[in-house]
């Protein structure tokens, strides 16, 4: 619905702005805001694993709603493979969810992408990949270029070639989140 001031949907726009703040926290773990939030809300985990908790401030609860947009609109770029969970994270070019799906015979054990590399090398271990995945996903994984210098894995914004976060595309991701019912009434009322 268009408003008279050119705003299409204020709730989606607000959610996109919260997503931008979450994106900044993800991209700059050395920032003062990241350090303060880590000390208070996720001292023993990573930002990606952070939960709301029972004593969440309005700010923290709002940022976690922005996280939902980032999770839908971002993918991982493989670097050293230490941060990406093979089964749970978005890292292969396979819409709609960009995730590897476990074949029935594979046990769902936590595994990071680095376990798919040759021992001591930045090359795919094709035997291990073929053992764990279906033909289509094996082909997609083997096409992913690997860093020769072992850079860290990086979260990139999927809608933009350079991987930079854009409010415009975050707005459309926020609309998807809201329309799917992922932003349920209980979350809105608690903010």
Predicted regions and their residues:
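A helix-boundary/hinge signal
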Residues: 1-191
């Amino acid at each position: 619905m268009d408003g008279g001031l050119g705003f299409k949907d204020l709730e989606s726009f607000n959610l996109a702005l919260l997503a931008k703040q979450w994106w900044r926290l993800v991209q700059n773990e050395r920032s003062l805001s990241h350090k303060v939030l880590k000390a208070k809300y996720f001292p023993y985990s990573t930002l990606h694993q952070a939960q709301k908790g029972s004593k969440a401030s309005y700010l923290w609860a709002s940022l976690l709603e922005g996280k939902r947009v980032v999770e839908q609109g971002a993918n991982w770029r493989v670097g050293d493979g230490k941060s990406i969970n093979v089964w749970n994270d978005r890292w292969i070019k396979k819409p709609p969810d960009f995730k590897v799906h476990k074949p029935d015979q594979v046990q769902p054990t936590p595994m990071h992408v680095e376990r798919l590399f040759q021992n001591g090398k930045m090359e795919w271990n094709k035997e291990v990949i073929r053992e764990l995945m279906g033909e289509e996903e094996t082909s997609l994984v083997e096409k992913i270029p690997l860093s020769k210098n072992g850079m860290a894995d990086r979260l990139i914004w999927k809608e933009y070639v350079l991987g930079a976060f854009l409010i415009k595309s975050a707005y459309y991701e926020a609309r998807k989140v809201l329309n799917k019912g992922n932003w349920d009434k209980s979350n809105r009322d608690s903010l």
